[in-house]
């Protein structure tokens, strides 16, 4: 079994995080939706195919949710040197949380690679607190 390694030049970043509260589409115990916009950039010298992702959501109440799966929003992006893949998705919660994420794939030689997304906070907006999150429109 070969281990995955970080590929120099392959980066992931959170471009934007916005917040939406309530509505009929959200469960009553998780009325807070965070929409995240992410870009994965391949500045390495080789082509990379992304195959899946892993998220670890650490909630302030002590619960830890691990989300793993094949594909990224239903896709397996193939990134040649200099290309980017951007997407958005969301997470619903009842409490504040910190998210750790990574994406895994293979390079053109078939080696397993991964890239880590820097951790980010899903902080529910409250009076007197100025979290680094925007309220989503509509």
List the predicted regions and their residue ranges.
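Asparagine-centered strand-capping/turn motif at beta-strand->loop junctions
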Residues: 39-44
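Short acidic, flexible loop segments centered on an aromatic residue
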Residues: 46-65
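Short, solvent-exposed loop/turn segments enriched in Ser/Thr/Gly
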Residues: 31-37, 98-100
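Intrinsically disordered, low-complexity Pro/Gly/Ser/Thr-rich segments with frequent PxxP/GP/PP motifs
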Residues: 65-96
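Low-complexity, acidic Ser/Thr/Pro/Gly-rich terminal tails and inter-domain linkers that flank the onset
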Residues: 1-31, 131-133
